[in-house]
UniProtKB/Swiss-Prot annotation:
Keywords: Ribonucleoprotein, Ribosomal protein, RNA-binding, rRNA-binding. Pfam families: Ribosomal_L25p. Belongs to the bacterial ribosomal protein bL25 family. Gene3D superfamilies: Ribosomal Protein L25, Chain P. This is Large ribosomal subunit protein bL25. One of its GO terms (cellular component) is cytosolic large ribosomal subunit. GO terms for biological process: translation. One of its GO terms (molecular function) is 5S rRNA binding. The keyword Disulfide bond does not apply. NCBIfam families: PRK05943.1. This is one of the proteins that binds to the 5S RNA in the ribosome where it forms part of the central protuberance. Part of the 50S ribosomal subunit; part of the 5S rRNA/L5/L18/L25 subcomplex. Contacts the 5S rRNA. Binds to the 5S rRNA independently of L5 and L18. It comes from the Bacteria.
Amino acid sequence: MFTINAEVRNEQGKGASRRLRTAGKFPAIVYGGSEAALSVTLDHDSTMNLSEKDGFYTDVLTLSVDGKEIKVKIQAVQRHPYKPKITHIDFVRA
C-alpha cells in the first residue's frame, strides 16, 4: 500500500500553483463521497518515486493530510508536455 504525505492548500489559482511547482511541489484535489472537495499540496519528488512503482495507478492509496488518513484512488494525472514532471493529480475517495 502506498502512503502519500499531503498538506491542505489554501491559495488557489494559476499564480499559487506556479509558486508551488517552483518550490518542488504540485497541487492536487480530492473529491467524491459525501465530503466536500479538498485541495492539497504534494511533494513532487516523493510522488514521482512512488509513481514509478507497480500498482500506483490502480491500488487504493492513503493520503495523510494533517494527521488524518484518507483512502483514495487516482482519477487523472496531468504531466508536463516534455519534462518528466507531474503538474496535477485528481484523487477520488475510495
